[in-house]
């Protein structure tokens, strides 16, 4: 299934993500220069999130250009964030003008790929299936991606050739 996800919005998936599902966020722009305006938070942060039916953020992927970091976390609904896990941002996207973030939902972890190359495995902290995705930015900042992302949900069983 394909969905359009606008900056500062949340979209319901057509159905909850099934076991071994894959979500691909695609942009037609990449700007890795830090946002000139840090706004009230003081942190250059754009993020995409996988959210369950209860409103828990199962996986938060923050792009913090000024800190040269991808930040991974989980956020139980109405509670504080857990400890951040980080990897360097520099060099992950290469020269691509159509960047993508792909998340493969394994039973115990998320495999995170940037431009279809695995960069991190994030151990699941919260239960539930992804039913929504969001694309957010801190107030007053410019995003590294286009204002609209394409979101594709797929499964290996549907894309792998099968022998007869």
From Swiss-Prot:
Induction: Induced during fruiting body formation. GO terms for molecular function: carbohydrate binding. The keyword Secreted applies. A carbohydrate binds at residues 45, 64, 73, 81, 84, 138. Changing residue 45 to A: Abolishes chitooligosaccharide binding. It is found in: Secreted, Extracellular space, Extracellular matrix; Secreted, Cell wall. Homotetramer. Oligomerization is required for carbohydrate binding. This is Galectin-3. It comes from Coprinopsis cinerea (Inky cap fungus). The lineage of its organism: Eukaryota, Fungi, Dikarya, Basidiomycota, Agaricomycotina. The gene is Cgl3.
């Amino acid at each position: 299934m394909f969905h359009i996800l606008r900056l500062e919005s949340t979209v319901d998936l057509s159905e909850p993500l099934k076991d071994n599902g894959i979500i691909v966020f695609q942009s037609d722009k990449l700007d890795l220069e830090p946002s000139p305006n840090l706004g009230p938070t003081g942190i250059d942060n754009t993020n995409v999130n996988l959210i369950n039916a209860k409103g828990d953020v199962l996986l938060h992927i923050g792009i913090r250009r000024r800190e040269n970091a991808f930040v991974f976390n989980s956020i139980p609904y109405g509670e504080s964030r857990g400890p951040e896990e980080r990897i360097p941002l520099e060099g992950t996207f290469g020269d691509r003008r159509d960047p993508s973030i792909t998340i493969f939902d394994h039973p115990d972890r998320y495999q995170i790929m940037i431009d279809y190359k695995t960069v991190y495995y994030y151990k699941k902290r919260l239960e539930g299936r992804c039913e929504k995705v969001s694309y957010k930015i801190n107030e007053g900042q410019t995003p590294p991606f286009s204002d609209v992302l394409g979101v594709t949900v797929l499964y290996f069983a549907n894309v792998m050739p099968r022998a007869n």
